[in-house]
């Protein structure tokens, strides 16, 4: 495979970021890309998000990691992968095409708290127990959030998804998100992100220069 062909340092699990929303009860089909039969809204959330043990339908990810590691040379690393909480909710609510949104609504915070954070916490644990050295959070819609909401949200991620797994959870966002705000949130929290990924459109030299200050 690519690891042998190109001598990459790491392998990463790619499992569609929307599987957790399907696990929670949303009807997801592929035609050819992912399509929800019904999008999430305040009025239907309690009716749609009904699965009592959603993590059980994600156990295939652990098996995929274990099987991949059986084939990896000892000097190669294995990285797990989940979608960011807001990104999952943005796609589930058909807001993922928007550049910006207004404030996160109270019902959206409730969905994050009651459904998405708990499932993703278990999802991270599942992948780490299967042998992943690190799990990356891919938050491709985080740029939609206003600065105040982004700050609150990042602290929630650090509390709900990172604190239990020191040095094992990284974070990536893109498309104009403020990396200054991401680094600030991580630096100020007792258990920071294990690593922060940067958009390919951003000069990594600029990030390094700022981090030296």
Question: What kind of feature is each model-predicted range?
Answer:
Residues 1-30, 155, 159-160, 188-191:
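N-terminal basic, low-complexity leaders that serve as flexible interaction/assembly modules and, when applicable
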Residues 4, 121, 128-129, 184-189:
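Non-catalytic positions within long, well-ordered alpha-helices that form the structural scaffold/packing
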Residues 9-13, 78-82, 135-137, 169-173, ...:
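Hydrophobic faces of well-ordered beta-strands that scaffold small-molecule active sites
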Residues 17-28, 81-101, 130-153:
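Active-site-proximal loop/short-helix segments
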Residues 29-126:
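Active-site-proximal, glycine-rich beta->alpha crossover segments in alpha/beta enzymes
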Residues 62-65, 144-158, 180, 200-212:
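Active-site-adjacent beta->alpha loops and helix N-cap segments on the catalytic face
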Residues 123-181:
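Aromatic-anchored, glycine/proline-accented short structural segments
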Residues 162-213:
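Catalytic-face loop-and-helix region of soluble metabolic enzyme cores
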């Amino acid at each position: 495979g690519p690891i042998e062909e190109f001598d990459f340092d790491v392998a990463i699990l790619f499992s569609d970021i929307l599987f957790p929303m399907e696990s929670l009860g949303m009807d997801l089909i592929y035609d050819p890309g992912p399509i929800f039969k019904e999008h999430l809204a305040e009025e239907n959330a309690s009716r749609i998000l009904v699965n009592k043990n959603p993590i059980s339908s994600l156990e295939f990810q652990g098996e995929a990691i274990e099987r991949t590691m059986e084939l990896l040379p000892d000097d190669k690393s294995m990285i797990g992968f989940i979608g960011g909480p807001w990104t999952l909710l943005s796609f589930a609510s058909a807001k993922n095409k928007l550049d910006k949104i207004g404030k996160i609504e109270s019902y959206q915070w409730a969905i994050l708290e009651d459904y998405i954070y708990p499932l993703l916490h278990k999802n991270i644990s599942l992948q780490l127990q299967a042998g992943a050295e690190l799990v990356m959070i891919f938050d491709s819609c985080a740029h939609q959030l206003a600065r105040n909401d982004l700050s609150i949200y990042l602290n929630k991620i650090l509390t709900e998804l990172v604190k239990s797994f020191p040095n094992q959870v990284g974070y990536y966002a893109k498309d104009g998100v403020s990396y200054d705000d991401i680094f600030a949130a991580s630096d100020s929290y007792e258990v920071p992100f294990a690593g922060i990924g940067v958009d390919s459109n951003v000069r990594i030299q600029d990030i390094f220069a700022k981090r030296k200050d």
